[in-house]
């Protein structure tokens, strides 16, 4: 984490985020009030995914999805065969979703560009996510995630609110993370998932308490990071989980 942070959270990226927020403050405020997702979170996603729209991908989405759907690279490793098969099936479904999306949104899918995996727009939505979570933010009857900022902001916020399965998505006003204070005799453990499955009492029993006030009924997971000055321990709450559901990386 210490190495990744230095290379990724540069001053230029931070300054770019501030400028982007200032430029789109009114629309971001409206979306934040409607969905309960902070403007800073929405803009951070755009900054991470596409450098605030500076690079949305140069691959033709149709070609990328077709290649991964029918020519997914095989390693020849039997232990990876099942995983590679699932990935191929995933991209076949996304290819079908792309054709449906083109019909619904009147898009020329042959001209769309995006990532090598078929993600599109400033928020890098896959076709299935585009169809399920994109919203018309300005009332013009279309959902444009490439150039219409009201649609882009509202769609990212809507994704946060609705994506999450049985656990649900973003909780307005809820905590994201809190630095953990280690108690004497704390027990080392590393949860296998990002799911916030532990009560504060359970975490306290293991020797981890939040350094800042949080709702007593909140649940969390433990996140361990290799910081510049040694290992860091954080508690990740429901809204942290919602962020990981957008993109684990």
Segments from the language model and where they lie:
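C-terminal soluble interaction/assembly domains
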Residues: 184-249
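Acidic, glycine-anchored loop motifs typical of Ca2+
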Residues: 137-145
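Phosphate/pyrophosphate-binding betaalpha-module
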Residues: 71-118, 123-124
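Secretory-pathway/luminal and periplasmic proteins that interact with or process carbohydrate-rich
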Residues: 50-60, 71-76, 104-110, 124, ...
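Substrate-binding/active-site groove segments that recognize
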Residues: 62-74, 120-135, 156
């Amino acid at each position: 984490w210490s190495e990744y942070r230095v290379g990724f959270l540069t001053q230029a990226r931070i300054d770019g985020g501030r400028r982007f927020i200032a430029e789109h403050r009114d629309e971001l405020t409206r979306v934040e009030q409607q969905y309960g997702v902070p403007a800073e979170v929405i803009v951070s996603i755009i900054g991470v995914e596409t450098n605030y729209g500076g690079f949305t991908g140069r691959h033709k989405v149709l070609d990328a999805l077709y290649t991964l759907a029918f020519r997914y690279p095989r390693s020849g490793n039997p232990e990876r065969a099942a995983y590679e098969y699932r990935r191929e099936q995933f991209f076949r479904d996304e290819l079908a979703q792309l054709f449906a999306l083109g019909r619904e949104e009147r898009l020329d899918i042959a001209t769309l560009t995006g990532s090598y995996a078929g993600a599109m727009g400033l928020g890098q939505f896959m076709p299935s996510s585009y169809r399920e979570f994109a919203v018309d933010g300005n009332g013009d009857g279309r959902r444009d995630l490439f150039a219409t900022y009201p649609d882009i902001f509202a769609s990212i916020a809507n994704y946060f609110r609705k994506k999450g399965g049985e656990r649900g998505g973003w909780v307005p006003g809820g905590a994201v993370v809190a630095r953990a204070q280690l108690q004497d005799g704390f027990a080392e453990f590393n949860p296998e998932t990002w799911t916030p499955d532990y009560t504060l009492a359970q975490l306290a029993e293991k020797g981890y308490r939040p350094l800042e006030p949080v709702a007593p009924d909140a649940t969390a997971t433990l996140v361990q990071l290799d910081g510049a000055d040694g290992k860091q321990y954080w508690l990740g709450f429901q809204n942290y989980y919602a962020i990981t559901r957008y993109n684990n990386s």
